[in-house]
């Protein structure tokens, strides 16, 4: 079974780096359906994410940026906040344009696969890896796989009473 990790866990792995190194390896990743990671460099005015790839650049069109963008259940701020952070994606296509590799990528496809093959199979009481993405007075938002958000309410964080989630967690922490 394929493993689904919070964003940022795959970016420096040898397997991820190898699959991003050339046009040929990107095409092989597209064929195999591999989920890869790279850093989002820019969010354009149309909210497309431009991703830095070792062999060129990738483009995640706005409607491929996250589950729920098309139907409005996810707001555009979810894309804008990904700038300068690792994002997961699947390669849709890759080609040479003007001597440089340009790849069309889909973060939504990676998230949909994560939901179908991982999240939908979780049961109450399962312990899963997560990365803390944001702290609020009422709880901690975490990435539970491929950038999919979840909330840990403050009353579920500790046996003893705490005044703020920062008493237990830090942003970026793997839990």
Feature locations, PLM:
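Single-stranded RNA-binding regions, centering on S1/OB-family and related RNA-binding modules
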Residues: 1-175
